[in-house]
């Protein structure tokens, strides 16, 4: 089925985090962040690998101390995905991790300090040919901006970003991306809209401290959905109080829903009602669990009755319609009858077979 609407993305410059392009005509990348103690090398490496296996393009690692920087050096050698170092307060840590192989340096304008410190961070980024992310957060704005605006506002966040941009411009450094994050949806959206109209550097999107898996997913989907639908955004991170792997899955689901990036199974399912001829909810949950590891794009429909079933099944690669009997559709055409006892096994087999077909 052809999309009704194709989002026209904002034109932006391109930077590279490791071998991952961000901005320009590159796909919108999905990233997450470790929540282990960085000094626990084994646990951090394991979590990075889990995030990577979930499909993430990039991983951010907090580096709060020199000891964590030393651990980062070891971690970097044990993984094969670009790592972004998250730096707050101590600019000297940024200098260390740049030397140790960081693929990008995230600095917070609210706490990184004076211009001379930023100059040193930029010099390190130039020496090692890595980008910087200017990561503005509503909760940690510069003290004078807090006093000027009395509370976080989109305008305060944009002003914070431009202070850093002006410094980087003076240094002829253009290898950077920017984020403007708040936990309030419209503050975040308005800040990004203002900034996006004034610069062409790539933008990292996120609703910070969005909350639990359920509510954080809802907030992030609304906030990022508004921006992405306007073509704003080049890389995303879904901030959830949950397993980082969940962040990756939600991120790709948002992009998939907007037809911005296809990855994994797009599972279409009815909410079920008394007309259903099999337990739709049970079948969908089990099928989704079994197909979770698939990264190749494929559309699958599970519809419990014949009201909308035929129309949905004709538009996907694998479709199931509840009836007497149930019908299996492949590539929009009726393929076979299928009993309730074997629904999940048959659907899983057909999905995997379709992905193997040339």
UniProtKB/Swiss-Prot annotation:
It catalyses: (2E)-4-hydroxy-3-methylbut-2-enyl diphosphate + oxidized [flavodoxin] + H2O + 2 H(+) = 2-C-methyl-D-erythritol 2,4-cyclic diphosphate + reduced [flavodoxin]. GO terms for biological process: isopentenyl diphosphate biosynthetic process, methylerythritol 4-phosphate pathway; terpenoid biosynthetic process. One of its GO terms (molecular function) is iron ion binding. The keyword Iron applies. It holds the Pfam family GcpE. Converts 2C-methyl-D-erythritol 2,4-cyclodiphosphate (ME-2,4cPP) into 1-hydroxy-2-methyl-2-(E)-butenyl 4-diphosphate. This is 4-hydroxy-3-methylbut-2-en-1-yl diphosphate synthase (flavodoxin).
């Amino acid at each position: 089925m052809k999309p009704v609407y194709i989002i026209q993305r904002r034109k932006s410059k391109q930077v590279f985090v490791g071998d991952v392009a961000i901005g320009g005509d590159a796909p919108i990348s999905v990233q997450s962040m470790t929540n282990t103690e960085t000094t626990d090398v084994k646990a951090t490496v394991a979590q990075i690998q889990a995030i990577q296996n979930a499909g993430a393009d990039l991983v951010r690692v907090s580096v709060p101390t020199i000891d964590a920087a030393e651990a980062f050096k070891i971690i970097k050698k044990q993984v094969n995905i670009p790592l972004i170092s998250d730096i707050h307060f101590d600019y000297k840590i940024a200098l260390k991790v740049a030397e140790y192989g960081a693929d990008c340096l995230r600095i917070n304008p609210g706490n990184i300090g004076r211009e001379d410190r930023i100059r040193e961070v930029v010099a390190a980024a130039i020496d090692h040919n890595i980008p910087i992310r200017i990561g503005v957060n509503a909760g940690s704005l510069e003290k004078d901006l807090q006093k000027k605006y009395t509370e976080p506002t989109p305008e305060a966040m944009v002003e914070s970003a431009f202070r850093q941009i002006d410094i980087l411009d003076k240094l002829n450094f253009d290898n950077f991306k920017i984020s403007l994050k708040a936990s309030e949806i419209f503050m975040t959206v308005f800040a990004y809209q203002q900034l996006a109209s004034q610069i062409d550097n790539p933008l990292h999107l996120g609703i910070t401290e969005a909350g639990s898996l359920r509510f954080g997913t809802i907030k992030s989907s609304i906030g990022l959905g508004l921006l992405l639908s306007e073509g704003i955004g080049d890389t995303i991170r879904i901030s959830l109080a949950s397993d980082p792997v969940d962040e990756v899955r939600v991120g790709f689901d948002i992009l998939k829903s907007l037809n911005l990036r296809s990855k994994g199974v797009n599972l279409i399912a009815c909410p079920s009602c008394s007309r259903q001829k099999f337990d739709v909810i049970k079948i969908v949950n089990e099928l989704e669990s079994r197909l979770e590891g698939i990264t190749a794009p494929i559309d699958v429909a599970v519809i419990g009755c014949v009201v909308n079933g035929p129309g949905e099944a004709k538009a996907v690669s694998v479709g199931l319609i509840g009836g007497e009997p149930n019908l299996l559709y492949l590539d929009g055409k009726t393929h076979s009858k299928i009993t309730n006892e074997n629904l999940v096994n048959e659907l899983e087999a057909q999905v995997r077979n379709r992905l193997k077909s040339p």
